[in-house]
Amino acid sequence: MERMEQFDVAIVGAGPTGLACGIELERRGLKPVLFDKGCVLNSLYHYPINLVFFTTPELLEIGDIPMTSLNEKPGRTEALKYYRRVADHYKLNIHQYERVLDFDGSDGHFTVRTEKTCYRAGKIILASGYYDIPNKLKVPGEDLDKVIHYYREAHPYYNQDVVVVGAKNSAAIGALELFWTGARVTMVVRGAGIDAGVKYWIKPNIENRIKCGEIKAYFQSTVKEIREHDVVIQTPDSEVAIKNDFVFAMTGYRPDFEFMAAHGIHLDPETSKPITDPQTLESERPGVYLAGVIVAGTHTNEIFIENGRFHGRLIAEAITQKLTEPQT
């Protein structure tokens, strides 16, 4: 039987938080390995192409390597380039396109099974983010090809009838870019208006487009059914069928709670937050740690790159301390 490769720590997820964990472990002389089902920075890669971060470069930095930007706020492409450079600098061992299927064992003696093979690891860090699983509308027709949960760019939807579901940042930005590119945009919003948390330079813009009728909006309304050539919505007054070519269901995303629960990670029944030690981010399953936005459960607006990047240091210090404690 082929001998399994051994690592001190296996990190599930190679986004900014996963990279930060790998860096801090390397700095302490440990041997980590990172796995991602897609490319390195897979979620960031799938962000809208023209995305601009609502932050300054220094707040995205990891590994004490400066990040520079042409503008006050960095964009997606600059962030991808920066994090690749950091990964190269620290020579991180990243297994791209290798999904982790499961892991078993106990603290110090885990077996990690991927699509390709199995590995040994002393500790596990789950840093898989939340961008992989969209919150579904749960309506008939959602499985049609014209329904899109990830907005990337507007060009393919020129001169098309487009419905945007939602009213937070991704929905507002997507609706504006689609409108500017020549799509006929209708927004369907569950609440009474555009979300108060929308970026300050976006919110008045989208509200003005709606006010002057350039973008149609149905507030306090929900999607009932998606059909090949239209979308049926329920408004406060009646059902309305909207002519439609594409639907952008910008209803948010969530971590893979099922994977966590299946691997002994207990979740808070109200918030779905994993139960962790706040000082170490170790879960109730010894040897399994959580990092980044998955720590926030369904409250995904509580943790961003800006604060999740510090989880790596916290976890690495905890792991190092455990490994150096005298055995009793």
Q: Where are these predicted regions, by residue range?
A:
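Beta1-alpha1 glycine-rich phosphate/pyrophosphate-binding loop at the start
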Residues: 14-92, 172-200, 269-270
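AMP-binding/adenylate-forming core of the ANL superfamily
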Residues: 124, 245-248, 289
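A conserved FAD-binding loop/helix module that cradles the flavin
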Residues: 292-328
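Beta1/beta-strand and adjacent pyrophosphate-binding region of the FAD-binding site
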Residues: 3-17, 160-165
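Residues at the starts of beta-strands that form the adenosine-phosphate
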Residues: 8, 31, 161, 183-186, ...
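Predominantly flavin-linked oxidoreductase catalytic cores and closely associated redox partners
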Residues: 105, 117-202
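A Rossmann-like FAD-binding core segment of flavoenzymes
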Residues: 94-112, 118-119, 180-271, 327-328
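FAD-site-proximal beta/loop scaffold in flavoenzymes
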Residues: 142-156, 253-302
